[in-house]
Amino acid sequence: MPKLQHTDWPDRLWVVRHGQSAGNVARDAAELGGANLIDLEHRDADTPLSALGERQAGALAEWFASFNENQRPTHLLSSPFVRAHQTCAAIALHLDIGLDGIGVDERLREKEFGILDRYTVQGIRAKFPDLAEQRALVGKFYFRPPGGESWCDVILRLRSVVEVLRRDHVGDRVVIVAHQVIVNCFRYLLECLDEKAILEIDKLADVPNCSVTEYGFGEGRDAERFALRRANYVPPELAATAEVTVDADTPAGPK
C-alpha cells in the first residue's frame, strides 16, 4: 500500500482518460441497434480517436499549455493504444515536448476482454450466458473472462507503475494518458480504496473523455501529503470548445 504521507512522489500527477474513440461511436451504434457484435475495422489497440475525440484532445492540450511554466507537466506517459497515444501527442505538441518525449508503457493498456472482445452486453448474454451469469455472481472486480483480465489483474500491473513513479519521478509533474478502467484502478491504488469503494465510484458515473484526475501535495499542514486533489475534472477549455462525452470506455465487452 502506498505511503501517501511520504514525499517520494511526483509533485503533481494527472491521470487522463483518452478522447472519444471511433470504438466508442461504434459501440453506441451497436447497442442502439440491438446488435450482438460491434462493427469495427481495427483491433482494439489500433482504434483511433473520433473527430470529436481529436477536438477534445486539442482542448485538453490547450488547458495544460495555459499553466505557468513552473506548473506545466514535465513528463508524459501513455498507453500504447492509438486513441490514448493520439491524446497524449496533442498534449506533447502544445507543450513543445515532442512526440519522442512520450513514454509509452504497455502496463497502461486497456483492460483485456479475451473471448468477449467486440461483443455488446446483449451479445454476451446471447452468446455466453454462462459467463454473463458468472460475472453477475462474482462481480466485475474479480471476474476474468477467458483470455482476458479482471480488475485485479489490471491493478497488479499498475502497482509496478506506481513504484516507477515513486522511484524515477520524485518532484516531477507527470501526465498519464490511458483508459477508464486504468483511471479507476489508479484511484484504487493511490487512494487506498477497497472493492466496495471503487465500484461505488465506478457505478456513480463513467469517466468523461479527456477528463483529469489529479494528485499532488497541498499547502500548510497538508504540504507533505500526496493526495487526490480533483477527480474526473473537465477543463473549461474542453467544456467550451468540444462536446463532453462519457461513453463507456471500451469498444468490446463489459468494462
Region locations from a protein language model:
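Beta-strand elements within well-structured catalytic alpha/beta cores of enzymes
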Residues: R12-V16, L77, D172-A178
